[in-house]
Structure formats: structure tokens, C-alpha cells
Amino acid sequence: MSIVNELVNRIDETYDVSQIEKEIKLDNIALSDLELLATGGYSPLTGFLGKEDYDSVVETLRLANGSVWSIPITLPVTEKVAESLKAGEEVKLVNNGNIYGVIQIEDIFVPDKEKEALLVYKTTDEAHPGVKKLYERPNVYVGGTIILTKRFENNQFPSYHLDPIETREAFKKRGWKTVVGFQTRNPVHRAHEYIQKSALEIVDGLFLNPLVGETKSDDIPADVRMESYEVLLQNYYPKNRVFLSVFPAAMRYAGPREAIFHALVRKNFGCTHFIVGRDHAGVGDYYGTYEAQEIFTNFTIEELGITPLFFEHSFYCTKCEAMASTKTCPHGKEDHVILSGTKVRELLRNGEIPPSTFSRKEVVEVLIKGLKKEVVTE
């Protein structure tokens, strides 16, 4: 499948903001969204959603023009700030004293957050991290086209922080016609490795694209995860078949809807295929095990523009003495060692070393070292 969609580009570092007086302060989520809107990561979006598109996305998983889009990308402001704004004006977008862009306001509206929570996250339970964040953010949304006027100083992972145009170029340079994307917020354990390598058997390249934006407090820190990916790729993957780059978005924990969103974004980064595993982007027990795969049946491959690859839950089978899934292994549950990022995190935080059936020893060493450092700095 060739990539025909045009990338949005809303970057203009020469744009004059000196005459613009009003400003909106961005939180970390809005800041990372601003960057991804501007670089084309969120193509076809050109800005934060106005009311018509917002309502359409929340209710139908499509923009008002019918294009598939499953997560509302919004710019929340307080009532006080909203009172000072009006449609038709340009306003600076600021974070931590720096001006990063402008928004050309088209719309100011009050969303029904309970409805957004129920339809996007399938729950109004504030124990859900996505719902909690939704309710914590201000209550008025500002919609409009954006311009990014200043690039972020990406000090944490500068060499891995690439725009969609750059990853597309990198794939082209390698001669990859088919590329499978893999989204992760966890260290890669053996079940992930099995799935990635199974997918790699049928495509030219693997795009490992860990999310490094805002995540839950008990998720393993991004710098530790990045080091774990580096040692894994160095020791267990063919160098000419994998590409590592970060995804600077915040985690929404929206399960099925976020699986669609993650696929659409990876299409923009240049992928032709996208891996959807068990409970993709899930949290707790809010979503069914394979709900994130089932949601794809609502859309055609043509309108998605990317082919999802579905994988069953994989495990280590003590009888097969190998990684397997129920599709490839005849043995019972008593012979299966179930692996999960949650389990690996749990073992590590309890000071236990995950067995080699769970994680590669080089990865475990990095995680132990990283978590010790985390404990020291807390």
C-alpha cells in the first residue's frame, strides 16, 4: 500500500507574533499536541478541533467531512480566559514563558465532558487516568488552525525525535516499501518481541515508536525505557530491519479508540501496517481483551490508509519451550507463562528479577539500574 496522504505542515518559525497580545497557556498535553499538529503527525488535522468536528469525533469517530479520526484533540482554557477571547482573533500559545505558536480562533465552546468521557473512554469513573485528566483540565475548548513558531528543545532524546517527514525519508532511504509500526509505553518483553518479529517476517521494516509524552505515574520513566529499547535492538534485532524513534504524544488510555488513533498517526509517520495486540492502550479492566482489535471492523482498510495486524495474547510455553499463542500452541494454561508489562513492572518494583522467559537479561539490567536511580531521586 503506497502512502498517498499529504502531510500537514504548520511550521513557520519566521511568523511574526510581536503584535499579538493575548495568550493561552498550554499544559503538557496541549503542548505535545501542538507539535504533532504542526509536523503532520495528526494529519489531516490543521489545528485544535472546533465544535462541529469535536462533536463528530466524539459521536462517530469521524471528522465532520467523514475522515476517520477517533480521539478529540482539544485546547482547554478556563472560563476566565475564554471570556477574553473571541472567534476571528489570533492568540499566542505559551508554555513555561516561551511562545511556541499561535491559534487562529474559529470556535469557543463548552463541551459535555461527561459525554466525552462516556463515549471516548467508555466510563465516567475518575479512577480511569484518561477520565481523571479530562476532568482536571479546564472546561472551555478553543478550536482553530495553529502555526508552530518555535520548535521545542528536545533535550531528552534529540537523536530519536523525528518528524513524520523525516521518518518517511528514513524508510525510503532503506528501501522499505512496507513498514509495520509498534506502539509501546512499556519496556519490550518477550511477548512483544515475539509479536514484532512475527510481523517483521511479512514486511520490510519495523518502526518501534515508543510514546514518551505524559503517562501514568506508575509507568516506567521514558529515559529508562529508551535505554531498554536500545540494548534490545542492539542485541536481538537485525540492525537493517528496525528503526527507533519517539512518539511525543501524551497517553490517553482510551483503549479501542486510541488503537485507531495510534494507527492513523503511524500512517502519517510512514507505516503501511500497524500492530494491534491484546488490550491495546488499555488500563485496568475498562476494556475487553480484544476490543481494540474489534473496533477496526467499523472501517475499511482504504479509509484507514493503513493495515492493522492483529495478534493474540502470546506467552512462553514450558512444553513447547518457546514463545507461542493459542494459534500455534496446543498445550493447556498450566504450561503457559503469561507475560505483561504490568507484571514486569510489579516484579521490578518489588526488587525481583523477571525470569529470562519474561525479559532479556540486558533489558532487565537496564530496568533495575533505572528504577534504583528513580528510587534515589524520589
Swiss-Prot record:
InterPro entries: ATP-Sase_PUA-like_dom, PUA-like_sf, Rossmann-like_a/b/a_fold, SO4_adenylyltransferase_pro, Sulfurylase_cat_dom, Sulphate_adenylyltransferase. It is an enzyme of class 2 (transferase). It catalyses: sulfate + ATP + H(+) = adenosine 5'-phosphosulfate + diphosphate. Its EC number is 2.7.7.4. The gene is sat. Belongs to the sulfate adenylyltransferase family. GO terms for biological process: hydrogen sulfide biosynthetic process; sulfate assimilation. It comes from the Bacteria. The keyword Repeat does not apply. HAMAP family: Sulf_adenylyltr (MF_00066). GO terms for molecular function: ATP binding; sulfate adenylyltransferase (ATP) activity. The lineage of its organism: Bacteria, Bacillati, Bacillota, Bacilli, Bacillales. This is Sulfate adenylyltransferase. Pathway: Sulfur metabolism; hydrogen sulfide biosynthesis; sulfite from sulfate: step 1/3. Keywords: ATP-binding, Nucleotide-binding, Nucleotidyltransferase, Transferase.
